[in-house]
């Protein structure tokens, strides 16, 4: 089958797949270290979804009041509901201030205080004095377009350091030999050629799989391509049952209203005009952790206190804030609310509803970004030649629930750490290990089979079925009955993939084929998500079970590892959470009841 296609071969020291915040920080970091670096991306780099990140990036700079990276670590561990690995969380929080200053030096146009320091706003779950003090102003912001500012700056740095970009190239599969990754096969959408990239290290920075759900803040390109490739390579994914619902997606549109809106003083109300978060989180109120706020909103709606004709959403009030604050600190939100909700935020509340926003789960890695698998003794062993960073990865710094503004931090800290590790492991221009023709043939055969699929089901119809099933069966609240039913339905939908129909057989700009390949990636991840959720019989972070309402550390303080074997069977395994710190600069944070 390889002879039927024009395959172009390349050799690089490193290939990064994805050009969002994590991918670009990794790519130029590696190029800066003297490694011949390629960056493959299915869309132009500055269209990557990092551009949509609004509220900010967290670091204990202390510009707006006393702060300490140890407090930041405590909040992150608590936010993770004690499922985050404390060594990785320490690494991230300790390196956060330097990461921000590095971004500033690269040219990120952060908003400023009157003294000229980087402006920091409060965000959910961020406190001082190990949770005993007041809310921390820790989230560094560039108005409400922080991701946009960071992504453009990182792209400029990538060009400066001569990263070779392959733009509008779609990654098909990893080249694996003897349990090692030796490259990646991709499809050039512009001219229809297939490319075999050989590399000493492949970095997956492909983002999350939010589009497995019907309503998500994610772009339609967020199809978890890295996770799909990892599953097909026989690797497990970690903690996939933990899907974050952002409290404030615009009702019916799903577009994000940043948590920064509540950080600036916005608040939620029900049909009675009551600020209901005071009942659920008396101390933090509207700035409780995202899973807490999303559940509170869902309960209000369920109990008949929702607003609107169908009583199926709540209101976010910003109209008490001065127009000057809205214009200077939340300009994008004002525009988004006007376009997608028809609301003037200076006069009217915004209709909002919890919306799928972030995947805490992903490809398991250590804090160097190296992909890890569990060996027979419950220890981790590294998959040679393969790294994963950003939302595609599970380090795990977010555990069962991510704190707002820790995601942009995750991107730059672990993007940088992956580059440093790669430079340590790889000698520039060293010879590549061989690959078997059969490995390449297998990838091309799968691609060709999908391309010539001539069944009865349209890709769009099957995708919609999956999205609606995930929305109804793996949502904010879950039960065994609903999850088991969802697992059966997603399995059936995945089986339906064998009967898809591709109308366009061409190789140049074939969006029908792109969407079919993306759907394959989404279906595998949807499947392991719902099976992992059905297996975890407790409530922790974003995984809220009505039939098991309490956290159960004795049985369930462990990471889920889920994979799909060659027969298509779901395999669920577990490994311990790392409860020890990296250094003695801070003691391990013992599990406690999570109250805001």
Swiss-Prot record:
Residues engaged in binding FAD: 18-23, 41-56, 225, 391, 407-408
Annotated protein name in UniProt: Succinate dehydrogenase flavoprotein subunit
Membrane topology: Peripheral membrane protein
Family: Belongs to the FAD-dependent oxidoreductase 2 family. FRD/SDH subfamily.
Residues with the Tele-8alpha-FAD histidine modification: 49
Catalytic reaction annotation: a quinone + succinate = fumarate + a quinol
GO CC annotation terms, alphabetical: plasma membrane
Compartment(s) of residence: Cell inner membrane
EC number(s) given by UniProt: 1.3.5.1
EC category name: oxidoreductase
Top-level taxon: Bacteria
Binding site for substrate: 246, 258, 357, 402
Cofactor: FAD
Provenance organism: Rickettsia felis (strain ATCC VR-1525 / URRWXCal2) (Rickettsia azadi)
Keyword annotations from UniProtKB, A to Z: Cell inner membrane, Cell membrane, Electron transport, FAD, Flavoprotein, Membrane, Oxidoreductase, Transport, Tricarboxylic acid cycle
InterPro entries reported in the protein's UniProt record: FAD-dep_OxRdtase_2_FAD-bd, FAD/NAD-bd_sf, FRD_SDH_FAD_BS, Fum_R/Succ_DH_flav-like_C_sf, Fum_Rdtase/Succ_DH_flav-like_C, SdhA/FrdA/AprA, Succ_DH/fumarate_Rdtase_cat_sf, Succ_DH_flav_su_fwd
Residues annotated as the enzyme's active site: 290
Alphabetical GO biological process terms: electron transport chain; tricarboxylic acid cycle
Record's subunit section: Part of an enzyme complex containing four subunits: a flavoprotein, an iron-sulfur, cytochrome b-556, and a hydrophobic anchor protein.
Chief localization: membrane
Coiled-coil blocks: none
A Pfam family matched in the record: FAD_binding_2
Pathway assignment: Carbohydrate metabolism; tricarboxylic acid cycle; fumarate from succinate (bacterial route): step 1/1
MF GO annotations: electron transfer activity; flavin adenine dinucleotide binding; succinate dehydrogenase (quinone) activity
